[in-house]
UniProtKB/Swiss-Prot annotation:
The keyword Chaperone does not apply. Galactinol synthase involved in the biosynthesis of raffinose family oligosaccharides (RFOs) that function as osmoprotectants. Promotes plant stress tolerance such as heat, chilling, salinity and methylviologen (MV), a superoxide radical generating drug, by mediating raffinose accumulation, an osmoprotective substance. It comes from Arabidopsis thaliana (Mouse-ear cress). Mn(2+) binds at D127, D129, H265. It comes from the Eukaryota. The lineage of its organism: Eukaryota, Viridiplantae, Streptophyta, Embryophyta, Tracheophyta. This is Galactinol synthase 1. One of its GO terms (cellular component) is cytoplasm. Its EC number is 2.4.1.123. The keyword Metal-binding applies.
């Protein structure tokens, strides 16, 4: 086990992570990755994420896996923000008529394509409605061979189809309601929120994911359910601070230390900052208003816009472009050259 990482025997325990004293930030085969589809306003979330990673001085790039329906204008915006744009083809479940918890979840199966980005040894996936408020590059140094993510909460109404919701059981507070083994059998495996996870791209895994999807009936939470099923044997929980789902603020406030949170997931209804009105349930809370403002502070900060590094090639190109101008001035007799003294 790597230095700075401990894990108890309790299956419910999360991996405890400490920042290494000398993080290896020179690896070019690591990256963050997000997903974008369509011509809507989610591009604002991705721009905000790119600027947030820049603000916390992440050493690694942001790759945007996007479907073909993302317009050229949005692609240019993301390239101008320093993102690496990768077009991917859609992935559909075998039965599109399945009732998902949210209708748009069907397109999220396309996220499986990120497992073929094998030019990277490790990647951290982040949804476009996530913002990073502290550097999390150290997560890349966690031991290989696992998928790391934060456990989800089952207390919102979107989980009403599950036995967990019906008996008020939640893995975020397993001591409050004991799982009834006699009636329901063994408790379910730990379940992560797929808005943020650390994984290892691999072509064999990628092909097997697609094969397995073809014979797996779709379920309400689409690719999140599928990933939990597929990776349940290698999933390792990490602390809540790496993916604060906003519902935790009112469902499990005892588990949240807002001042220590590194990553915020604006997935609660009405919480996406670029659509925020404050009218939906729980959106009038002061902590929500503060987090929405915090996101906008980053998005609106022009100093965080990507600045292309000046290279020797760029400088030479500039000089070449100036030659006709200098020649014209010389011929007009308006430019006199002064021989520079020798440096010898």
């Amino acid at each position: 086990m790597a230095p700075g990482l401990t894990q108890t025997a309790d299956a419910m325990s999360t991996v405890t992570i400490t920042k290494p004293s000398l993080p290896s930030v020179q690896d070019s085969d690591r990256a963050y990755v997000t997903f974008l589809a369509g011509n809507g306003d989610y591009v604002k979330g991705v721009v905000g994420l790119a600027k947030g990673l820049r603000k916390v001085k992440s050493a690694y790039p942001l790759v945007v896996a996007m479907l073909p329906d993302v317009p050229e204008e949005h692609r240019r915006i993301l390239v101008d923000q320093g993102c690496i744009v990768r077009e991917i083809e859609p992935v559909y479940p075998p039965e599109n008529q399945t009732q998902f918890a949210m209708a748009y979840y069907v397109i999220n199966y396309s996220k499986l394509r990120i497992w073929k980005f094998v030019e990277y040894s490790k990647m951290i996936y982040l949804d476009g409605d996530i913002q990073v408020y502290e550097n999390i590059d150290h997560l890349f140094d966690l031991p290989d061979g696992y998928l790391y993510a934060v456990m989800d909460c089952f207390c919102e109404k979107t989980w009403s189809h599950t036995p967990q919701y019906k008996i008020r059981y939640c893995q975020q507070c397993p001591d409050k309601v004991q799982w009834p083994k006699a009636e329901l059998g063994e408790p379910p495996a730990l379940y992560f929120n797929a808005g943020m996870f650390l994984y290892e791209p691999n072509l064999e895994t990628y092909e097997d994911l697609l094969r397995t999807l073809k014979i797996t009936p779709p379920t309400p939470f689409a690719e999140q359910d599928f990933l939990n099923m597929y990776f349940k044997k290698i999933y390792k929980p990490i602390p809540l601070v790496y993916n604060l789902v906003l519902a935790m603020l009112w469902r499990h406030p005892e588990n949240v230390e807002l001042g220590k949170v590194k990553v915020v997931h604006y997935c609660a209804a009405g919480s996406k900052p670029w659509r925020y009105t404050g009218k939906e349930a729980n959106m009038e809370r002061e902590d929500i208003k503060m987090l929405v403002k915090k996101w906008w502070d980053i998005y609106d900060d022009e100093s965080l816009d990507y600045k292309k590094p000046v290279t020797v090639v760029d400088t030479e190109v500039d000089l070449v472009n100036l030659k006709p101008f200098i020649t014209a001035l010389t011929e007009a007799g308006r430019l006199n050259y002064v021989t520079a003294p020798s440096a010898a």
